[in-house]
């Protein structure tokens, strides 16, 4: 049998509307290989969640992963979830696209946003938000 030349890792992408955080771990998730956040690549706080910041982070992450010997990534996308937003922010899709363009092999892409089974009490009180 041929020797496996690929080494896989997991890219955890947390994408909210305020920030995007990418962490690369080994397959067990126990050892962190590299990580980056929006504040590390842009100056203004309002740009931390932008697709541009996500692309720059993904390029840095891909380079650091290759230096450590990782050739492929499984991707786990997470939004804030629970009582907050359940859809990922604008940086998630841009980060995945930039990782594949940077030469990383993409394995599985899964959504790991926490979803409540009974929900928590909604923000805004009994009468709701009055506009």
Swiss-Prot record:
GO MF assignments: rRNA binding; structural constituent of ribosome
Subunit structure as annotated in this protein's UniProt entry: Part of the 30S ribosomal subunit.
Protein role: Located on the platform of the 30S subunit.
Gene Ontology biological process terms from the UniProt entry: translation
Membrane found in the keyword field: no
Gene Ontology CC entries for this record: ribonucleoprotein complex; ribosome
Gene3D superfamilies on file: Ribosomal protein S11 (3.30.420.80)
Keywords in alphabetical order: Ribonucleoprotein, Ribosomal protein, RNA-binding, rRNA-binding
InterPro entries: Ribosomal_uS11, Ribosomal_uS11_archaeal, Ribosomal_uS11_CS, Ribosomal_uS11_sf
NCBIfam families, per database record: arch_S11P (TIGR03628), PRK09607.1 (NF007176)
Family: Belongs to the universal ribosomal protein uS11 family.
Recorded coiled-coil stretches: none
Protein name (database record): Small ribosomal subunit protein uS11
């Amino acid at each position: 049998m041929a020797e496996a030349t690929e080494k896989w890792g997991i890219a955890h992408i947390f994408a909210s509307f305020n920030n995007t955080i990418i962490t690369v771990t080994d397959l067990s998730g126990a050892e962190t290989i590299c990580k980056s956040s929006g504040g590390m690549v842009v100056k203004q706080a309002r740009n931390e969640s932008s697709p541009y910041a996500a692309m720059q982070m993904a390029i840095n992450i891909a380079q650091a992963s290759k230096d450590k010997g990782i050739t492929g990534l499984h991707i786990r996308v997470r939004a804030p979830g629970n009582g907050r937003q359940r859809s990922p922010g604008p940086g998630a899709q841009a980060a995945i696209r930039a990782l594949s363009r940077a030469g990383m092999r993409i394995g599985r892409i899964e959504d790991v946003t926490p979803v409540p089974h009974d929900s928590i009490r909604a923000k805004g009180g009994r009468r709701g938000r009055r506009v």
